[in-house]
Amino acid sequence: MSVINSFTQHTINLTRKALRLGSDFVHPVHDDTPDEPDYLSNADVPVETNIALPHSDDWDDGHLTVTDIDPATGLLTTSTEGNPPLDEGTSIYDLYADRAERMGDEPLYTYKSGNDWVTVTANEFLADVRAVAKGLIHYGLKKGDAVAFMCRTSYDWDLTDAAIMACGGVLATIYDTDSAEQIRNIVNNSDARLLIVQDTDMRKKADGAVEECPSLEHIITIETGGLDEIKAYGTTVSDEELDERIDSVKKTDLCSIVYTSGSTAAPKGVEMTHEHYCQTALNLPAYMPDLLHDKRNTILLFLPQAHSFARAINYIAVSSNVRIYIATGIKTLISDLQVAKPTLMIVVPRVLEKVYNAASQKAGHGPKGVVFASAVVAAQNYMKEVSANGKAGALTRTRRAAFDPIVYSSLREVLGGRAKWIVAGGAPLDPELLAFFRGAGVPVYEGYGLTETTAPCAFNPLGTPFHAGSVGIAFPGFSLRIAEDGEIQVKGRAVFPRYHKNDEATELSFTEDGWYATGDLGRIDNDGFLYITGRKKDLIITAGGKNVSPGPIEEVIQRCEFVSQALVLGDKRPFISALVTLDEKSLRPWLAAKGLDENMSLEDAARNAAVRAEVQQWVNQANEGVSRAESVRKFIILPEEFTQENGLMTASMKVIRPKVIKRYSTLLNTQMYTKRK
């Protein structure tokens, strides 16, 4: 046995004896693909270059990515080829019809009904879609009519959506957490003739909202048999009439108005066409045919499908051979993962943060906690060396290998044990957290997109060499460029045309030469990889004129094990400050380990000297990475988190900065920023 192997086994044995961890922890795939570099160095690559990215057995040649200086604008621009334009008659219904033709008797959706998991084949689903679509036609739904839809992620969501698409309707999305006022605004903005809600609680909320909705004719509740009633009415509509309606739908027809969750402003209705979703769905499989065409692969849907991200992924899965599992809810996610054992997952960073915090909390503050902390460092160091040098050194690889059977493997099992491609998007992911998951063998890849780009406009294909902090290359069919002020601008067939009934917002969102201005700040490296550096609207300009991007500072503070959220403030203020919230589940064991009252109220914890001292350490660490003018001078710990329930977080788990500032305005004006006498 070699010295390295002997050392590895000795470390494993000692750790197992000390901890007896077994499977106490809850998978990244290994980045060590034979004959393939972990990191594609760009040190000697000129800016003007055409790049055919390296690939492994897990992904195909895909499309050519070109990165160069646009001679017309002088801006660094990167583009990835996509499929040719779709036929004029292509619609979302075709994705389901094609799946049924290819794999009619094989599973398409699996979901939980009561205590049992139910599987629906592609043929069965298509028959369901046609039955509901006929019923909608009977209700008088004409091509181009809007249907407002309020429903949690479920089989009913996919069925209703597909049926509305089949008969040429326009789906106006409502989050299941939206208020009565938001329901009213969406129904009126979309001129919806029908409102479909999932359950009686939503119906009660809707009943209080629709008195001032002149376009609304019917409210249908799924829980009380609404879809069955629609199907029954549909028996009077012939297949020929339905097929005539389906054939009338064109790719350029409006199919949906997706209402943004509004983290910095009032929600806007983004107009989407059949082409937007179909182009996105049919472009990705060209990049990863082995992953998406293998019938053994599965995906678990759990994010809100009212969000464009989750909805686009559903269409991508339908257009592939992947079997789709639908989670029963975020609270049952861990148990649902054990059933679905997904090879693909789409997550927002908050989910990964919760997984990490749960594992850390389970390890505790004793010997297990020491080992878990060491495992985190080992994984992060491994990926840092991979990023810097192309390969990790022998000692770093050995340290990482020692933790795999006792920490990393259990983490992979919690996520189902088969994950090959986990895409994180919707918000920035802490680079340290990404490095941990990737170093631990959990295949987390960052992507980037917006509702206005039909979700993904940049992504890291499976097998992409690790580029620390990058959200990837341009998604097939997209071009990305960086404006002179650092703003990311996007062009492509899947970019939205306008905001519904909002010409002013539309005009402000596009450049004179037709590029969508995202409002996000970033850079593109010589290999065409995009890095997000901040958001223009979040950019803080202090009273002294200093520009501060809050994201990187917030990420560091949130690494404190019991901090849930950090919001950095200071726009037009004399200095930078932060509001910090506590993760109660992580806080209590920390208090106990410090010999403090683990049952103290959150109000007391927010004032506790030891708690404040721990947070101060992370604030200090964040300050080390910025100039003095950008550093956090003062922070306040709040006794409540920012949540959807208190209106401070969107359904896509983004903190709504203006609402937080408004809610705590008195606190900010009297305790954070006191006027000089």
Predicted regions: what they are:
Residues 119-123, 255-281:
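Conserved AMP-binding A3 loop
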Residues 474-542, 559:
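Conserved ATP-binding/catalytic segment of the ANL
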Residues 84, 108-162, 179-184, 231-235, ...:
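Conserved AMP-binding/adenylate-forming core of the ANL superfamily
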Residues 24-28, 201-251, 359-410:
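ANL superfamily adenylate-forming
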Residues 104-107, 221, 235-259, 266, ...:
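Conserved pre-ATP/AMP-binding loop-to-beta segment of ANL
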Residues 278-298, 305-408, 418:
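Conserved AMP-binding/adenylation subdomain of ANL enzymes
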Residues 2-61, 139, 166-232, 614:
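Structural core segment of the AMP-binding/adenylate-forming
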Residues 465-468, 495-519, 554, 594-606:
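Conserved ANL (AMP-binding/adenylate-forming) active-site segment centered on the GW(Y/F)…HTG consensus within
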